[in-house]
Regions:
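Hard-cation-handling environments
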Residues: 233
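Active-site loop ensemble at the mouth of alpha/beta enzyme cores that anchors a bound cofactor
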Residues: 241-249
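Conserved PLP-enzyme active-site core in the AAT-like
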Residues: 1-230, 238
Length: 249
């Protein structure tokens, strides 16, 4: 589902399953806009968030409440590049019966398939690496399509009849695609964060060279890390490729 920006993709993904009185568990290492949406804006609408350090797997488990609707995070935290233990966090979410929503902007699908690591829903800011040329803004939501939304009364926006579409139940009508269809039918309609045609064209053009650009980003980064690590004027270097980084393994 293409959106006007990465933030609109994140907002739609959360508001599709969250209502006033609900709760989110989120990594504390997030893009600033994401952090403030969770910390300052959503509480005005009755949606609260508990933040957990991305390496604290047990902390994610302890933070889950009966009204928790999802776990949100970034695999590679922005800006501290702490790595979230997504496979373990995903197991915790599965045991709790809630989806894991991951912002995949930093790694792009070229470098990492987040679904293989346990994500249920992925959001991207296409503005950055995916488009690649600083010409257009955009975002997207990608649903894996195998989450069970029919868990009693846990997800009423998925299971209960929706008056906005003649009493339709999205889980019954669309099955594995229920989340995407609800986000499209309600969120896109009511909030209007549609991607413009020109931005869509520019982003698709940019994605054609994604593999070439990401390979170059990685090789350039390796050169920079090596240079800085061996420079006597540099006190410390923080990068997961270094053996002494806490998330190197």
């Amino acid at each position: 589902l293409a959106t006007a920006s990465g933030m609109s993709a994140m907002m739609l993904s959360l508001l599709t399953i969250c209502s006033a009185g609900d709760h989110i568990v989120a990594s504390s290492q997030l893009y600033g806009g994401s952090f403030n949406l969770l910390r300052l804006t959503l509480p005005r609408f009755g949606i609260e968030t508990t933040f957990v350090k991305p390496r604290d797997v047990e902390g994610f488990k302890k933070a889950i409440k009966p009204n928790t609707k999802c776990i949100f995070g970034e695999l590679i935290g922005n800006p501290g590049i702490e790595i979230m233990n997504l496979p373990e966090v995903s197991k915790i979410a599965k045991d709790a019966g809630i989806p894991v929503i991951i912002d995949g902007t930093f790694n792009t699908p070229y470098l990492c398939n987040l679904f293989d690591l346990g994500a249920d829903i992925i959001v991207h800011s296409l503005t950055k690496w995916m488009a690649g040329h600083g010409t257009s803004m955009g975002g997207c939501i990608v649903e894996k399509g195998d989450f069970n939304w029919k868990q009693g009364s846990k997800f009423p926006t998925m299971t209960e009849p929706y008056e906005g579409y003649h009493g339709l139940s999205f889980a019954e009508e669309f099955g594995p695609a229920a989340f995407t269809m609800r986000a499209r039918a309600e969120g896109m309609r009511d909030f209007g964060p549609s991607m413009s045609p020109m931005n869509a064209f520019n982003i698709l053009t940019g994605i054609e060279t994604l593999s070439l650009r990401m390979d170059k980003h990685i090789s350039n980064t390796a050169i920079m890390v090596d240079y800085l690590t061996n420079n006597d004027n540099v006190t410390w270097v923080n990068h997961p490729s270094l053996p002494d980084h806490p998330d190197h393994e």
